[in-house]
Amino acid sequence: MAVNQTMGRASISYGSPVFIKASGSVVGQMESEGPLGSYFDKVGTDKDDLFGADSWEKAESALQKEAVGITLQKAGIKAEDIRYLFAGDLLGQNIASSFGVMDYEIPLFGLYGACSTCGES
């Protein structure tokens, strides 16, 4: 039975509480040297800011994909266990996010806040 989750034109409500079971973070060398450095799950090297990709856009997608993979592993769940994924990126069209997570086949809410994505979600 489908449940109507809409509350308004741009709002939804969930039938049960929302929670975060795990998180995953992938950053470059510079971010790891800051005050939060010990909290990141994976750090690139100063020799490869692109994480093996041939463009910044592909690198950002790779970081998104890796972060989701780390999160799934830490939570001990599969992609099909996740109902929604909230993601945003520094590209104005959510290209890096959508390409980075598309193999997981999780419904994606694209957030357009760039650096404020964490707060928005």
Identify what each model region corresponds to.
Residues M1-F109, G113:
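Conserved "HGTGT" condensation-loop signature of ketosynthase/thiolase-family condensing enzymes
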Residues Y112-S121:
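Active-site-proximal alpha-helical scaffold in enzymes
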